[in-house]
């Protein structure tokens, strides 16, 4: 069978995942540089050292935001293209748009108590289901094409991603509803780096599945 739309859509999803991976890496670097700035100030290492670390952190923060936006846009474009070949891509598109809406709402209502936390949590949950439904779409296409090895690896990936994203949801709850944890610098660092590390692992696993799906359909 011919799944040209899914093939083209998945190619765009792969580019989106690369951008998302670079965004996560930039976010991780910004965390380390922010901690370096804080350490420089606390240790009286000098204003120049602190400003250098702070400037670097700002650059990587901006890179994280820009790459993240580009990744979401390409994801939506890819899913719009692929959805005509497999209905799970349509479901993933719905969750992706809902997650984007939650992110925008979180920024719009940033000064309102509780609401930003709820919207951030909603965005994380939407990301979980969007990823799962994309993997499910590739599983269904693999089954149609008789690629049972891809079916089994996709089913395993669904479980791994669900566990990893569930951990991300737990971290989202901690950071959004127990903000006092951020007043403890070491906990702030551990929570932030763990969250980004989980995100990077999911990106890599998901990217591997997308590439396999593209090659199968190509």
Task: Locate predicted features.
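Membrane-interface extramembranous regions at the lipid-water interface
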Residues: 1-33, 70-107, 122-171, 196-218
